Amino acid sequence: MSALFCDATHELDAIGLRCPEPVMMVRKKVRLMAQGETLLVSADDPSTTRDIPSFCRFMDHTLVASETEQAPYRYLIRKGQ
């Protein structure tokens, strides 16, 4: 796992969940975070490889890093405004 992922402020385990649950959980968790904090998401649903980057763009958050070559997938999100 990349060193970037080790410094996450918050973590969310979405392994075993299927669309749309992972993105719904990310949205709920990010709402409780302060601007600039980071969230490490672990998921194994292939749809997250499309849905989480789209969520970040739509909600003006930054997808700092991702590992999507094989499950479990990992995403590091920095909360925007």
Swiss-Prot record:
Pfam families: TusA (PF01206). GO terms for cellular component: cytoplasm. The active site is at C19. PROSITE patterns: UPF0033. Belongs to the sulfur carrier protein TusA family. HAMAP family: Thiourid_synth_A. PANTHER family: SULFUR CARRIER PROTEIN TUSA, SULFUR CARRIER PROTEIN YEDF-RELATED. This is Sulfur carrier protein TusA. It comes from Aeromonas salmonicida (strain A449).
